């Protein structure tokens, strides 16, 4: 029984030794903020534990454990001997770092809040802008849809004068020129604006007609043969078939491509049509107006058979002579006249009077009868194919008589 009791005692003593070693190891851990009282307590405990065995080492202690205890005691003694001022400085530094960390955290939180606020404001503002843009685009699209609906309804309704609706089909689509010729106008505006536009179109058509008449009067006048005259008349009648012919200029083609303005100008263009009719009648009779001694006369391009050679040479000489195209050379009837520097002087007029009087005295009865018949034919042609304005001028200024001697002299010169 004695052996069993010793075993129990040894087990209990070993447990106590193990717990003491663990406590020592825990206390040996380094603490930065160990107070002075704790250091003193630990040192006093160490000295007390050592005081009983001072000078008489225990039997169970080993040399390495003794050396470890000596190093620990030396470190504790150094800590105790250190002045208390160093600990205050360390505490201040530690407090400063803590304060700086807290202040920096506060600044970071404040900046984060400001950033969140800015982002929120930007999101709100951009959202408003996006909503405004979406609203504007939606309004524009609605306006376009309304305009398209109105245009379609207007096209389906057709003209407002009670006519039948025209069915839209590709085969029955009218030409835009014909639509404009009918008078259809879908331009927006009031009645006054439409009337002003129509008036402007009429004025433009009048100006174009005047320009056309001016261009026709400035063309060089020739003496064509009857076959050529009939061909030119047929070309003028057939507008659409021979626009590429040399008789058509750019103005004729341009005016012929605008039938609507021609119909609009049926009323106010009677004067221009009368002028053109008078010109066509003059061209049909193949007459040429010649100015001699400030007297306007018309000479037939086809003279009587007795004096055909003389008159043909005279007409060819007058038609082939170049005439400068300027507005100052036109008379009221639209024919050419010579400029002032080409008119005869007084001396030449006097010579012509003397030669005319001498020739009239020495004229034979046959020549007198021939000149009378020729002048009568000229007067008949003048009364048949001239306008009243030219008749007034011819009444004021009678035509000069052409004698057989003058005609024979001119034929000899030619």
From Swiss-Prot:
Residue ranges, compositional bias (Polar residues): 231-244
Determine the domain of life of the protein's source.
Eukaryota
Q: Where is the composition biased (Basic and acidic residues)?
A: 164-184, 274-289
What are the subcellular locations of this protein? Nucleus; Cytoplasm, Cytoskeleton; Nucleus envelope
GO BP annotation list: regulation of cytokinesis, site selection
| Region: Calmodulin-binding, residue numbers | 119-132
Membrane-spanning parts:
none
The free-text function statement in the UniProt record for this protein reads: May be involved in cooperative interactions with calmodulins or calmodulin-like proteins. Recruits calmodulin proteins to microtubules, thus being a potential scaffold in cellular signaling and trafficking. May associate with nucleic acids and regulate gene expression at the transcriptional or post-transcriptional level.
Q: Which family does it belong to?
A: Belongs to the IQD family.
Please describe the quaternary structure of this protein.
Binds to multiple calmodulin (CaM) in the presence of Ca(2+) and CaM-like proteins.
Protein name per its UniProtKB record: Protein IQ-DOMAIN 8
Protein species of origin? Arabidopsis thaliana (Mouse-ear cress)
């Amino acid at each position: 029984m004695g052996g069993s009791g010793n075993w129990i005692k040894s087990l209990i003593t070993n447990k106590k030794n193990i717990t003491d070693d663990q406590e020592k190891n825990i206390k040996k851990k380094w603490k930065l903020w160990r107070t002075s009282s704790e250091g003193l307590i630990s040192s006093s405990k160490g000295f007390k534990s050592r005081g009983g065995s001072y000078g008489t080492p225990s039997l169970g202690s080993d040399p390495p454990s003794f050396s470890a205890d000596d190093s620990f005691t030396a470190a504790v003694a150094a800590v105790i001997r250190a002045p208390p001022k160093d600990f205050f400085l360390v505490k201040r530094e530690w407090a400063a770092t803590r304060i700086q960390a807290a202040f920096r955290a506060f600044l970071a939180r404040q900046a984060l809040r400001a950033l969140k606020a800015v982002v929120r404001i930007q999101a709100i503002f951009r959202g408003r802008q996006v909503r405004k843009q979406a609203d504007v685009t939606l309004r524009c699209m609605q306006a376009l849809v309304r305009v398209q609906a109105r245009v379609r309804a207007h096209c389906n309704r057709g003209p407002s004068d009670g006519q039948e609706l025209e069915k839209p089909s590709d085969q029955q689509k009218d030409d835009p020129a014909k639509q404009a010729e009918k008078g259809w106008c879908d331009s927006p505006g009031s009645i006054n604006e439409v009337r002003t536009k129509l008036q402007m179109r009429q004025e433009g058509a009048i100006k174009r007609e005047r320009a056309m008449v001016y261009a026709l009067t400035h063309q060089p006048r020739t003496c064509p043969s009857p076959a050529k005259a009939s061909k030119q008349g047929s070309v003028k009648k057939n507008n659409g078939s021979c626009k590429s012919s040399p008789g058509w200029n750019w103005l004729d083609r341009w005016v012929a491509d605008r039938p609507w303005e021609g119909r609009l100008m049926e009323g106010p263009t009677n004067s221009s049509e009368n002028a053109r009719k008078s010109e066509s009648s003059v061209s049909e009779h193949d007459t040429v107006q010649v100015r001699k001694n400030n007297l306007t006369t018309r000479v037939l391009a086809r003279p009587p058979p007795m004096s055909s050679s003389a008159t043909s040479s005279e007409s060819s000489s007058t038609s082939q002579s170049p005439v400068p195209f300027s507005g100052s050379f036109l008379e009221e009837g639209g024919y050419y006249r010579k400029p002032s520097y080409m008119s005869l002087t007084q001396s030449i007029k006097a010579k012509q009077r003397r030669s005319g009087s001498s020739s009239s005295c020495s004229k034979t009865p046959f020549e007198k009868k021939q000149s009378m018949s020729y002048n009568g034919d000229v007067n008949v042609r003048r009364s048949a194919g001239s306008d009243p304005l030219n008749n007034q001028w011819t009444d004021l200024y009678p035509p000069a008589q052409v004698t057989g001697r003058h005609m024979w002299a001119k034929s000899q010169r030619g």
